[in-house]
């Protein structure tokens, strides 16, 4: 492809796509009930996955005319499916989710937490980094063959998910501070006594993720 095509399809269109992915989540930013970093990360990741999924379906609609077994090397088709159906949505989810998390961190989180992510917690830096990740992924699809493109986009997806994981971790810490510490119970996972809160103080399991029957049994056992 020539330079004009690369600039249009590899840079301009991905940047416009990222902007569209951000519109929905940022509309929710002023609402005070969505005041956690985890809210921003969730909205951004959901918007990105939905957008990329719709985009991939729209761009691939002609492929349905080839039937259930299109011609060509099956390995290359598997690489295409993994790239467009898994790796690229993960890049978008990680990048846009982390970008939205940076906005929530700056404008909704307590002042004490605003430096917890370093420079990546600054909205402008997060925008540039997230856009660069997505543009790099799209350029890899345009310029590389199927298997090298899958490898490159897979590495970018891993980087985006690590970044998103940092944002989610901070959001979970913020939510844990909003929940009061309750009475001692017996953790049904490790059977040690721990205070009623978000996680078991001994084994680290999420107490709210345990089955309700197990939680009731823990309270009953402690009462005895």
Features from the language model and the residues they span:
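Hydrophobic alpha-helical segments at protein termini of multi-pass membrane proteins
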Residues: 1-224
């Amino acid at each position: 492809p020539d330079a004009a095509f690369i600039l249009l399809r590899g840079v301009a269109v991905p940047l416009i796509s990222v902007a569209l992915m951000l519109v929905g989540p940022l509309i929710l930013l002023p609402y005070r009930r969505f005041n956690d970093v985890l809210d921003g990360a969730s909205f951004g990741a959901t918007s990105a996955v939905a957008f990329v999924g719709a985009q991939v379906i729209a761009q691939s609609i002609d492929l349905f005319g080839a039937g259930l077994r299109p011609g060509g090397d099956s390995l290359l088709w598997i690489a295409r499916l993994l790239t467009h159906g898994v790796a690229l949505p993960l890049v978008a989810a990680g990048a846009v989710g982390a970008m939205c998390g940076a906005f929530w961190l700056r404008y909704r989180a307590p002042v004490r937490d605003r430096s917890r992510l370093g420079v990546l917690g600054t909205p402008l830096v997060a925008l540039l980094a997230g856009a660069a990740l997505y543009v790099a992924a799209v350029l890899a699809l345009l310029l590389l063959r199927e298997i090298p493109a899958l490898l490159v986009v897979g590495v970018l997806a891993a980087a985006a998910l690590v970044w998103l994981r940092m944002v989610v971790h901070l959001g979970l810490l913020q939510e844990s501070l909003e929940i009061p510490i309750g009475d001692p119970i017996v953790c049904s996972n490790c059977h040690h006594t721990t205070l009623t809160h978000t996680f078991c103080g001994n084994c680290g399991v999420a107490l709210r993720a345990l089955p309700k029957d197990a939680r009731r049994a823990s309270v009953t056992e402690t009462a005895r």
